[in-house]
UniProtKB/Swiss-Prot annotation, chain A:
Organism field: Drosophila melanogaster
Keywords: Acyltransferase, Cytoplasm, Metal-binding, Nucleus, Transferase, tRNA processing
Primary location: cytoplasm
Name of the molecule in the record: Probable tRNA N6-adenosine threonylcarbamoyltransferase
CC terms in the record's Gene Ontology section: cytoplasm; EKC/KEOPS complex; nucleus
Molecular-function GO terms, alphabetical: metal ion binding; N(6)-L-threonylcarbamoyladenine synthase activity
Amino acid sequence: MVCALGIEGSANKIGIGIIRDGKVLANVRRTYITPPGEGFLPKETAKHHREAILGLVESSLKEAQLKSSDLDVICYTKGPGMAPPLLVGAIVARTLSLLWNIPLLGVNHCIGHIEMGRLITGAQNPTVLYVSGGNTQVIAYSNKRYRIFGETIDIAVGNCLDRFARIIKLSNDPSPGYNIEQLAKSSNRYIKLPYVVKGMDVSFSGILSYIEDLAEPGKRQNKRKKPQEEEVNNYSQADLCYSLQETIFAMLVEITERAMAHCGSNEVLIVGGVGCNERLQEMMRIMCEERGGKLFATDERYCIDNGLMIAHAGAEMFRSGTRMPFEESYVTQRFRTDEVLVSWRDD
Amino acid sequence: MMPQIANKPNESIIRVPFETPRLAEIAYKVLGVDQEPRRNFVKKTLSLENDVLVVHFQSDQVKSLRTAITSFFECLLLCQDTINQFGDSKKEKLIPESNDNAGTHSSSDSP
């Protein structure tokens, strides 16, 4: 029996989760929301997390009805992510570990998502599509590692969506990706956008620049261009949102299908914040059904960054015998998914 | 590898007293794990003198020194707040804990 407390704060969400043998005891979270047109910066995000984190720890222990002595391990996000917010989680985790004399474990953020997705959905050995504001990877498990078969070669798909939301000044509440999704539902007018799949990899920076020009034609005037008649451009924001989703989600479906074919896999698991998107889930489900496979996805309680996923991944590590010296309890902005030895899986 | 500091660096020594040597040691361990970002060219050395945490900063530039000290204080305050809220010394125990439970993993819940 392993009871784990997890601390997650690698981006603009700060969350604390408590889990015991696969049973969710607490999962509390706070989101740092910036005004429309602005992204969250590391310093301000860390300030928000510092103000919220101790209250969240206390409320999670109350919700779980536990004393500190009931905990077996404290887990925190070691990386990847933004350094100042990561540091907030790490410092609190270290301090609690020493105060309560409880072992400390650093968890990879991506593996937290994967293990939480596997637990909630019951998927055994799926091809994993991990899509969020900071990561875009196609992952499959093999020989004690979560192998990265394909990934973005520049910005994450969620980053592309978030920055486009900034361009058209969409609200960041509850999240820019969610607001793009809602706006896209009111249009079915497709605009042709660059489709940039490179084998198993994808690229989103070109699409972002292209659609930025569509959204704001007057901005960034190309001085070399001869003055032409202004193009007839009656695209609405909904049209742009719809087309952006159709294009980038089709790209994600393609690389996922290619990985399924390579691995002979019959299951797909979508994790990460963009995995909340129902249109992405629908497109992926269509592909899976055509291949005779099955799609697994979770709702926003677990898709979006949360402390519970760190607690669960950490509990799995702890149960399989992983221990971390206190001197190694630093944070790192880059922490590749395949760097972690998956000692808790035997297959 | 620590970056090279010029012969006449800008320096600052900060002494932080704690209630007990144990709390000072906790802060020393918690705050000593992280290295300063390499490109800042700042050297940070932590040491303990009983219940006082001593931090020595050295830097080429005053602005880097100021940034490093500001960041350190943010981390220190968070560590202290955590100790204040969850440490043993808290009289009114919202989360009761006694020394007898330290290190044990007792649980009254049935599996």
